[in-house]
Amino acid sequence: MSSFLDILGDGHVNFEKCGDVVVSPKDNMVAMLCHFCKDIFTHLPEFMRHLQWSHSDVLQFTKEQNVYRVEELMSLESSEDDVQSQANSCSSGDSGLAGEMEDADGEPGSSECLANNVEIMNALAAFDVDVDVLNNVSHEQSYSKNPPDSRTEGFRCARKPGRVEKPPSICDLKSYNITRHSRKREAIKQRLSSVKKRIMRSLENDVSKPRLNKLRSKLNNSLSSNISGPPKQSKMPSLLENSSVNELPAVLESTNPPSFDSEQPYVVSTTIKPSIRPCPSRTAVQTDRNISHQPVARRSTVNIERVDILPPINIKQKMKMSAKDIPFWESIIISSVASQQPSELNTTNNAVDQPPKRPERRSSLTVISSSPIQAMKPMRRSSMTRENTSPESSRILRSGEVESPAKANKRTKDSFEETSSSNEKGNAKRSKLEQNRCSMNFSLSASVTEYIRSDLKTSKLDLDSLLRLTEPLESDAFENTLVEDQVKNATKMGSPQKEFTKLQIGVKPEMEALKEDLRLLKTVGLLVLKDSCFEDKLPFEQSESFRKTAAKFSKIYHTYDTIWSYRKTKTIGVHQRLTEQLNSFTEEVNREIDCHLTTNEIKRILNLINSWYAYQIDQRFFRKATLSYSVEHYMFLFHFLPKINPTVYFCECCEEIFPNEARYKKHVQSVHAVHAFTCSECGKSFKRLYFYDKHLKTVHLKP
């Protein structure tokens, strides 16, 4: 303090009045009132910082920091007091009224603090009076008008902390979330378990019903067979009761099996019928001591009806193709498409409604012991010489193009000669076998008969399923002739009943157009356009080859957007450029797919694709129909085609293009169709006789 007073006495210090000191004798508190902003501060360092930060523009400090040495002015206060005073201040960071706070070394009302404050106040007051009297007078006037209140209402005391609830800790929140999620998980598990039980209960009920029905039907069939009548008498000779049992070994040694030609394949068919009557108890059989016999499990008695030897089967024989050399899967597809379009064929022949149903074939030998099933079996065919036909599994699948009629006739003759030669060889071997084989009616002793009856007590084997595999199916030949009959009926119904003079009558059969479309679509692998289920009739390798070909065609078709987009086709404006695009597209298709298609055939294929795609879009998006997997696959190949915008339909006979199918069909029907009635004078065609007669009367003035 002495250094500070020495500076004051020299008179070289420029002082500015910044505030007044306010004292509360009752509470022993001292505060400083800012002269510029009228704020009150309880600590001198805080007041000094306030002056430096808030009123530096008026006071014009020469240094930025520590203008006044707070350590020299208030040596008793430490830095901790400054921090605490700033924290307890209720005003802003640079001003405000602070609460009560104790000094670090002693209380504010101690003698040392009061002495220091009195000396500072006296020095400042004396300096203010001597230097600036006017400021002192104005200050006294303002102080007299607003005397400081002796009470402590103007000072803000430190607030007492209220009762604040302790917030939950992180561990409590985590445990709460865990318990809540666990409760939800348990509720979901209970709900799912109840739903699962209901589903399993419904499935068990659905499965148990057909089982009960099957058991009831089997029980009823067995009861009906038992009540229907006594079992049939066996055709075996009666047992010889007088024969002795000891003759069994000798008879077995003397009996030799019939000798057959080992090179000849044969199948022995036996019909074994078990008797339903219970087996009577009989005495033990006495056997020779020199021969060891093992006990054999005994069942019901068995009667052997007859033993037949079937004719040999030539599996390597090739199938006889039709005159047009069409693979069997093509005939099936044609017949299926023809059945889907009865209105186009105009057939009225009701003699043949449906092809005969294929008999069901067993995959393995099954044991059947019930008599009603035996009664329902068809009669076995006789072992007569019959023209052999190869089974369906041995047919050769061909996907090549249709050959010329000359090659087809040549291959038909070769196959016929090969078939006739194989039939002659089979007949010769069969006659030789019949001469060499022994009769199965050799005489058996009573012991042998008893041994056979006691040991061969097995259930009946269903060998008729093997016999059906050797029999040719009439439905195979029927499917090949079905299309020819339909074509004949269509041509008969489509031909006019009367022939008129000066008329050109020419009606193209619908089946011919259908076959032509199938040939074109088969070349590009798009048979699905005519038959959506054609892949079900083909093996996997054949269907995969069709899909690869269709993928190549669609990839090429996608690059020529001026062909399938009507907007771009319309902007071209010149038919010559469109014709050039079609020609280049045809050349690229022929080069990539290795075929020989003309521009008109390409136009026909594109028209079929556009018509099929528009129909499938209508079925899927507007009629909400479910499409098959194969149709979905082929639709994805042509996903770039417009679905709602108009597409391009090309006339196959001229260079006209149309935005929709209706205009295209109308153009073809009116301009390029072959009508039944054509005028010989002007060449105009008419669909019906009425319009033709009207034309003759009005234009050519003929009665």
UniProtKB/Swiss-Prot annotation:
Any GO BP: male meiosis chromosome separation
Recorded GO MF terms: zinc ion binding
Comp. bias regions, Polar residues: 84-94, 339-352, 364-373
Compartment(s) where it occurs, according to its Swiss-Prot or TrEMBL record: Nucleus; Chromosome
GO cellular component, one term: nucleus
Spans annotated as Disordered: 78-111, 140-161, 205-239, 339-434
Predominant location category: nucleus
Xref: SUPFAM superfamilies: beta-beta-alpha zinc fingers
Keywords: Cell cycle, Chromosome, Chromosome partition, Meiosis, Metal-binding, Nucleus, Repeat, Zinc, Zinc-finger
Positions with biased composition (Basic and acidic residues): 148-161
Zinc finger (C2H2-type) in chain: 32-55, 649-672, 677-700
Entry function: Specifically required in males for proper segregation of autosomal bivalents at meiosis I. Expression is required in the male germ line prior to spermatocyte stage S4. May have a role as a bridging molecule maintaining adhesion to hold autosome bivalents together via heterochromatic connections.
Family: Belongs to the Teflon family.
Misc remark: Drosophilid specific gene duplication generates rgr and tef. Teflon has a function unique to Drosophilids.
Protein name from the UniProt record: Protein teflon
Source organism of the structure: Drosophila persimilis (Fruit fly)
Gene for this chain: tef
